[in-house]
Amino acid sequence: MVKIVKAEEYLKEIRTLDILIEENFEELEKLDALSKKVTSTLSDAKVQSSSAEQSRVEACAIKIACLKDDILKDINRMLDLKKEAHNLIIKSCSPKCMQLLFKRYFEFKNWETIAIEMGFTYQYVSDKLHKRALNQLQKNLEKNERVDRS
């Protein structure tokens, strides 16, 4: 049995990837600063470094390289997901619903900001229009699931 992805879960994957990428960038900055600090300390000492110190520097360099690779993979996954979601939204949704979904799930705006920008009440955009938009998208997601299974 194939699980049909819910529209809101599908769109939230974009934000999840965005958060993961941001966290990895922060970790990369910490590792980069640490590696510069370690190599600077070793250079300032002007003594021959031990193999243990070199191993720590190498291990840090490897972690940095792996993290950069992970970040690039996540960015590519997020871009692919955004492109796919963007195309589905355009095919599925009315202009108002399209605008709401882009503001919420691509620009990560809160409901208050969206309501002001769209000229509606908070309750209307966060409840009624949001549900309508998700329902429109859900129909297309389910249609695509049926096509993919054939």
Feature map (PLM): residue ranges:
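Short alpha-helical "recognition helix" segments of helix-turn-helix
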Residues: T113-M118
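Short amphipathic alpha helix immediately N-terminal
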Residues: C93-E107
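N-terminal positioning helix adjacent to the helix-turn-helix/winged-helix DNA-binding module
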Residues: L81, K96-C97, L129
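N-terminal interaction/assembly modules
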Residues: M1-L88, S92, K139-S150
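DNA-recognition helix of helix-turn-helix
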Residues: G119-E142
